[in-house]
Each structure stands twice: as C-alpha cells, then as structure tokens.
C-alpha cells in the first residue's frame, strides 16, 4: 500500500505494510520517505518526523530545513507518546517504550526505552 501526499509542490511517500495499526493522533511529517513494515502497531500520540531545522539561528531564519528517511521494520510496537526523529531505522521485532525519543537506529530484536531512547534488553528471536 503506497500513499502519496503533496506538500510545498513536492510529492513524498509513505509506505505501509500489511496488518498495520495506528491508534489516535499519529503524526507523520513526511519531508522524506517513511517506510513502516508488516505487523507494526503504533500507540496513541506518536510522532514520526523526517524533517528538522539547523541548530544555527541564522540558517533557521533563512528557512533552511533538512529531511532524512525513517524506516520502521516488521513486528514493531511503538508505545504511546513516542517520538521518532529524522534518519532513524528501527529494526524488525522491536518494542519502543512509551514516551521514548528515538534519535538513533535501534537494532532488531530489541526493547528500547527512554529519552534519548536506548536498548535495555534483547528480545529473543
């Protein structure tokens, strides 16, 4: 299933796998491609943001921004209120705890929590 959205004259894509479920208030800011795998479950109030702005105020004031793709693997559960930031890949069979801020890649078969999000346990294959 491929969904296209239009923004600022460009076409961006969100690709969603089979048996995907998202609860209320999911926000996907798709300045770059977002891929969500099969059997992915997303709790309420999750934000998936591909876009960001420079730290330097003069660059921000020029209207500069960046966007990096996000990939969420198969059999992933993302807890309520989690935030997924630009450029992140979440591997297959991962659980992201509620309220986590995912700033870096999370390897497959992991339980990851916190701000910033970090792996606290391996989930057996």
Locations of regions flagged by a protein language model:
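Flexible, glycine/small-residue-enriched loop-and-beta-strand segment within the central core
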Residues: 10-16, 21-89, 115-125
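Extended beta-solenoid/beta-helix repeat architectures
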Residues: 88-91, 106
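Conserved coupling/switch loop of ABC ATPases
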Residues: 4, 86, 104
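Conserved G/P- and acidic residue-centered "switch" motifs that form tight phosphate/ATP-binding loops
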Residues: 96, 114
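Single conserved hydrophobic/aromatic residue that forms the stacking wall/gate
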Residues: 1-12
């Amino acid at each position: 299933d491929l969904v296209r959205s239009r923004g600022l004259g460009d076409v961006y894509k969100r690709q969603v796998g089979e048996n995907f479920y998202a609860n209320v208030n999911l926000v996907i800011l798709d300045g770059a491609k977002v891929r969500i795998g099969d059997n992915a479950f997303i709790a309420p109030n999750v934000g998936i943001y591909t876009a960001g702005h420079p730290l330097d105020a003069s660059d921000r004031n020029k209207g500069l921004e960046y966007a990096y793709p996000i990939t969420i693997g198969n059999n992933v559960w993302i807890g309520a209120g989690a935030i997924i930031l630009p450029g992140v890949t979440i591997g297959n069979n991962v659980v992201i705890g509620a309220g986590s801020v995912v700033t870096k890649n999370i390897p497959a078969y992991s339980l990851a929590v916190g701000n910033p999000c970090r792996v606290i346990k391996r989930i057996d294959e």
